[in-house]
Amino acid sequence: MAAKIRKGDKVIVLSGRDKGRTGEVFEVRPAEGRALVRGVNIVKRHQKQTQNQEGGILSKESPIDLSNIAIVGKDGKPTRVGFKIQADGTKVRVAKRSGAEIDG
């Protein structure tokens, strides 16, 4: 299946604890069907002290399921993603809400 959500996309959370929050995707894990979104789904991790790193409680992003996020369109609303083949044969992502091409 083609990647509808890619690194660098601006997305909005559709359900869960962070519903309505937006952020940028900085990692996609297609095998797991999950993505890491900056500033969303923050969890606390207790880090044990090592020689290189000090211990303590760290805040970091946790993966969120791809079904719970949607790309934000140019109008600021969530949109589904489709694909269109252009005249020169290249495949581009298209916002279903507006029909506009998605950069990337």
Swiss-Prot record:
GO terms for molecular function: rRNA binding; structural constituent of ribosome. Coiled coil: none annotated. The keyword Nucleus does not apply. CDD domains: KOW_RPL26 (cd06089). SMART domains: KOW. GO terms for biological process: translation. PROSITE patterns: RIBOSOMAL_L24. InterPro entries: KOW (IPR005824), Rib_uL2_dom2 (IPR014722), Ribosomal_uL24 (IPR003256), Ribosomal_uL24_CS (IPR005825), Ribosomal_uL24_KOW (IPR041988), Translation_prot_SH3-like_sf (IPR008991). Disulfide bonds: none annotated. It comes from the Bacteria. Keywords: Ribonucleoprotein, Ribosomal protein, RNA-binding, rRNA-binding. Part of the 50S ribosomal subunit. HAMAP family: Ribosomal_uL24_B (MF_01326_B). PANTHER family: MITOCHONDRIAL RIBOSOMAL PROTEIN L24. One of two assembly initiator proteins, it binds directly to the 5'-end of the 23S rRNA, where it nucleates assembly of the 50S subunit. One of the proteins that surrounds the polypeptide exit tunnel on the outside of the subunit. This is Large ribosomal subunit protein uL24. It comes from Nitrobacter winogradskyi (strain ATCC 25391 / DSM 10237 / CIP 104748 / NCIMB 11846 / Nb-255). The gene is rplX.
